Every structure is written in C-alpha cells, then in structure tokens.
Amino acid sequence: IKEYIKENNNLKKYDFMFYDLFREKEHILPLREEEMMARLGEVFSVSENTFRILDDVNLKFSNITDEEGNRVELNNSNYSVYIKSKNRRVRKDAFESLYNSYNNFKNTFASLLKGNVKTNFFISNTRKYNSPLEMSLYDDNIDKKLYLSLIEKVNDNLDIMEEYMTLRKDILGLDEVHMYDVYAPLVKGIDKTYSYEDAKELVIKALEPLGEVYINDLKKLFDSNCIDVYNNENKRGGAYSWGCYDTLPYVLLNFEGKFTDVSTIAHELGHSMHSLYSHKYQDYHDSGYPIFLAEIASTVNEIFLNRYCSLNAETKEEKAYYLNNLLENFRTTLVRQTMFAEFELLIHDLEEKGEVLTDEVLCNTYLDLNKKYFGDSVISDDLIKLEWARIPHFYTSFYVYKYATGIAVACKIVSDILDKKEGALDNYMKFLSSGGSDFPLEILKKVGIDIVNDDTIDKALEMFRETLEEFKEITK
C-alpha cells in the first residue's frame, strides 16, 4: 500500500493521514480480540458513566445561607458563585457543604476512579503500550518528556503561588488564608456595561497586534450573521464556536453586557478564526485541529484583551481588575491543571506498584499535592483532600495537561508578537492555517515553538511572575 501511495501523485496530499493511520498498526489486535474489545466498550465506560450519574443526579448538598440571609440550595452549578462571595462565612459554608457531601460518598468515588485507572492499564497492556500515559499521548504523538517537564517546571516555580497567596492574605486582611478564600475577589468588579457593538469594537482594538489581515477577516466574521448573540427562551446556556468545512464558523453566545461576556467573545472568536483559516488553507482531511492545539488561539485572544484593557484602564482599580483576571488564568490553568496532571501520574504509578487506590490513599495523595502547590501561605483544610472526587476530567485520563501547555504556548505567541520578534506574526498566521496537517508538536516546531526543549513553559511562568509584580505595585 505504501509503495502504491508513493507512486500515485493524486494520493500525495493524503501522506500524513495515511502515515498516522499506519502507525496504529502495532497496536491493532487480531480480529477476534478486536471484536472482544469492541464489545467491552460499554464496560470500559461504566466508571465514568456512574460517576456522572452520582455527581449530577444523586449527590445533594446541604442548604446554605447567602449574603442576604436567604436559605439557598447549593449545587455544582452555583457553587462557583458562593465560593467567590465577598462574605467569608458564605464561602466557608459553601465549601463545607460541598465537600461534606463528597465525603459521604468517598468510598464510592474512590471505587469509580480506581475502576477507571484499572481500565486504563487493561487497555494499554492489551494494546501493547508501555503505560496508560504513553497510550494517552500516542494519538497526538506527544513526547512523554513534555508531560514530565511541565510538572517539573511548574514545581520549580511554586514560589510564585506562595507570593500570590501571601498577597491574597494581605489584600483580604486575613490572619490566614484557607482553601475557601482562594477564589475570593481581590478587587472590586468593574461596573461597566457594554453594548454588543461596543464589545465588538473593544475586541477588535485589543487584537490589532495580530495584523491587518486577521482584523479584516475578524470584522467580516462579525458582520456575517453567523453569531447568535443574545439569551433567548429555550436557548442553551454557555458559549461555543462550531461549524463545518464549507461554511463560516458559527458562534453561540449569551451576551449580557458584562466584561466576562466581552472576554467570551474574544475567546470564541479565537476558535472561530482558527477554524476559518484551517478550513481555508487545508484540505478537508487535514482541516480539523486536535484538542492539544485548540485552546491556544482562544487563549491568545484573551491575553491580548486583558493586556489592552489593563494598559487603557481609566483607574488603578480597573487596571487591578484586569491584572487579577490574568493572574487567575495563570493560577487556574497553568498551575492548577498541572497539579491535576501530577495527581493522575501519581495514582497510576501507585496502581502499577500494586497499591490499592482506596479513598484514604487518594485523599492523602491529593492533600499532599495541594499542600505542595499552595505552600505554607495557605491552610490546606482537611476537606480539600476530597477535591479529586469532583473532577470529571480524571475519567478522560491524562487530558488536563493540554490546558496548561495551551496557555504556555499562547503566552509565548503573545510575547513574541508584542516584542516584534522577526517572523512572529507570520508564524502565528501559519499556525492558525495549519489545521491538523501534522502532529501538534510538529506544527508548533514549524512556527518556531519547540515546547519540549525550549523555554516556552518557563516564559509563561515568567509572565505569571511579572503580572504578579505589576499587580503588587498597583494594589499597594
């Protein structure tokens, strides 16, 4: 087959697709075994499916009293509202209500996660991979060194977290920071409201460093009638960018005029522009980009937006708000997702060594990690040891690291463009146009980013540190 492909020029454009297909051969089983694996598909999904039923349907949290004295029913959706409350009592009550409920089912959650880990080992051993980690990285042809390097580099810079949490304590006026204080707002939210037209103009202004071609195409997309802007009866919540190969991207928004809505526009249009250029410059079979690359373009736009708003803020308070947005992106994406990635690595290592993944083992492993990542500046309350039980991504193993590498690459792209590094803008446009025409690391190498061996992750951590210093100065 390979010889036939070589001799047939009409098939040349399918080179990568065939190469990617043929390299799977060593992990394909004889027919009877493949049939068995196919029949086991539903069995392999039992842990994840049961987790979702338990977490979404059966798990109930005790009611809490909100800031106005009203009794409210806590759930996974509104927890994020109350854990960010300005009222510390509300934050603590929400934290304890949530994790006490997980504590009641910790043995069940442990059994489900253990089942998922065992499934990973069964599949990876059966298909002759060296480990579940290498099996998960194989599809994107990711070097295991990147996964380990990410964890190592973030670990080497955890003093940033220590500084950030110490500053949090000072700004909030606390004697000590607990886990229920970690999401408390450090600065007052801005009161500005935006019309959709104003929001579009702000996003366009913020993204001007991406050049005339990008901006002109962005304006065309805004004017294309492909964006469903406002909330409406029976409309689903959230936001996303979607479409197919021979159409413009379609974007769903639920715009309400807040800055977070403006940020959502920048984020989703980042995905849309990535799709627009990939569909334009790649054949259909190479036009879809993998998850490893998907969050880069959207995060680039968010960083540019926060940077522009920070530079053009009218007050110190407003500038502090945008800087804090960026800090929280670093903390929750670069650091937190790396902590999750390290937890996954640790529990698979424990399983391989024959350790039984009981609730106690999982809780102790997670609590030790939490203490390491937050340092002495935060009290790692005992209940936080149960956080692993509520993370659905752990049932799609070795996935979350992609969020951390995504923000790291985005930081490098933004820095290079702002520093007017030779070829930086052209390289970014080339990246947006590459789709899935090669493996993710190869696509990045072609545009000057060797994330496995260069300083991409270090630069992101440096940007985190610099943003923290700037935030310190303005909040003195």
Residue ranges of model-derived segments:
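Catalytic zinc-binding patch centered on the HExxH motif and its immediate surroundings
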Residues: K192-Y194, I227-T247
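Conserved helix-loop functional segments at active or binding sites
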Residues: K205-N216, W242, H271, S275-D283, ...
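Long, K/E/R/D-enriched contiguous segments that form extended
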Residues: L167, I171-K219, D223-C226, H274, ...
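C-terminal, non-catalytic "cap/extension" segments appended to globular domains
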Residues: Y19-R23, N141, D170-Y180, I265, ...
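An active-site-proximal "capping" alpha-helix that borders the catalytic cofactor pocket
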Residues: L269, L293-N306, G406-I407
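Post-HEXXH active-site segment of zinc metalloproteases
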Residues: S263-T264, S275-T299
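A well-structured
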Residues: I1-G189, K200, I474-K476
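Short pre-active-site segment immediately N-terminal to the catalytic Zn-binding motif
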Residues: D191-Y196, C244-A266
